[in-house]
């Protein structure tokens, strides 16, 4: 008895439809981590910002503002669940404050070398989540 290629083709096509969102989501989460996660910061001063922005490839062109969250991946991800609350449309706010460093571009030109000023804070953070994973940090939120 020979098996028709149709069931195998169907499984393959369904796999293509189901897998890409997972890959795209993983890429967005990895980008979020690259841009905004630093578990153990060293210094948290202007040199820290200049070094981290360059290391994370956020200087071509010079990014105006970027915030690094200093915590565990587990605690940041938990904001997408029970450790966060709905905030506006499609965002979640952390139930607890996080240590953060915000790097603000201080140069006149958007071209490297990029100069940055560091601002250290301990505040609530707002992120967007997809299927329980952080994918975007809201730079515009400043906690009271």
Curated annotation (Swiss-Prot):
GO molecular function, one term: RNA nuclease activity
Annotated compartments: Secreted; Cytoplasmic vesicle, Secretory vesicle lumen; Nucleus, Nucleolus
Span of the signal peptide: 1-24
Protein induction: Up-regulated in small intestine by contact with normal intestinal microflora. Expressed at very low levels in intestine from germ-free mice.
An annotated GO cellular component: nucleolus
Chief location: secreted
UniProt motif (Nucleolar localization signal) ranges: 54-58
Active site: 36, 136
Record family assignment: Belongs to the pancreatic ribonuclease family.
PANTHER family for the chain: ANGIOGENIN, RIBONUCLEASE
A Pfam family it matches: RnaseA
Gene3D superfamilies xref list: Ribonuclease A-like domain
Record has Disulfide bond as a keyword: yes
InterPro entries: RNaseA (IPR001427), RNaseA-like_dom_sf (IPR036816), RNaseA_AS (IPR023411), RNaseA_domain (IPR023412)
Tissue: Detected in small intestine, caecum and colon, with the highest expression in Paneth cells in the intestinal epithelium.
Role: Has bactericidal activity against E.faecalis and L.monocytogenes, but not against L.innocua and E.coli. Promotes angiogenesis (in vitro). Has low ribonuclease activity (in vitro). Promotes proliferation of melanoma cells, but not of endothelial cells or fibroblasts (in vitro).
E.C. no: 3.1.27.-
Cysteine disulfide partners in this protein: 49-103, 62-114, 80-129
Protein name: Angiogenin-4
Keywords attached to this entry: Angiogenesis, Antibiotic, Antimicrobial, Cytoplasmic vesicle, Disulfide bond, Endonuclease, Hydrolase, Nuclease, Nucleus, Secreted, Signal
């Amino acid at each position: 008895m020979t098996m028709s290629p149709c069931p195998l083709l169907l499984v393959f096509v369904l796999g293509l439809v189901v897998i890409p969102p997972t890959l795209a989501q993983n890429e967005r989460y990895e980008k979020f981590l690259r841009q905004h996660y630093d578990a153990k910061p060293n210094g948290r001063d202007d040199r820290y910002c200049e070094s981290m922005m360059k290391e994370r490839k956020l200087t071509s062109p010079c990014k105006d503002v970027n915030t690094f969250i200093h915590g565990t991946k587990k605690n940041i991800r938990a904001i997408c669940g029970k450790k966060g609350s709905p905030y506006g449309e499609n965002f979640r706010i952390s139930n607890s404050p996080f240590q953060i460093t915000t790097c603000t571009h201080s140069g006149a030109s958007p071209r490297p070398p990029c100069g940055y000023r560091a601002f250290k804070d301990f505040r609530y953070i707002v992120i967007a989540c997809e299927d329980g994973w952080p994918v975007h940090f809201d730079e515009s939120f400043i906690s009271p």
